[in-house]
């Protein structure tokens, strides 16, 4: 479904969730 989850466990579809520069990983 395109959701990305941040290192803090919050999920969304915008770059703030999906950006690897923010330590996030796509599922």
Swiss-Prot record:
InterPro entries: Chitin-bd_1, Endochitinase-like_sf. Disulfide bonds join 4-18. GO terms for biological process: defense response to fungus; killing of cells of another organism. Has potential use as a flocculating agent in water treatment processes. Seeds (at protein level). GO terms for molecular function: chitin binding. Keywords: Antimicrobial, Chitin-binding, Disulfide bond, Fungicide. It holds the Pfam family Chitin_bind_1. Residues 1-27 form the Chitin-binding type-1 domain. It comes from the Eukaryota. Chitin-binding protein which functions in defense against chitin-containing fungal pathogens. This is Morintide mO5.
């Amino acid at each position: 479904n395109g959701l990305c989850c941040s290192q803090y466990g919050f999920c969304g579809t915008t770059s703030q969730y999906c950006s690897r520069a923010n330590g996030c990983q796509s599922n």
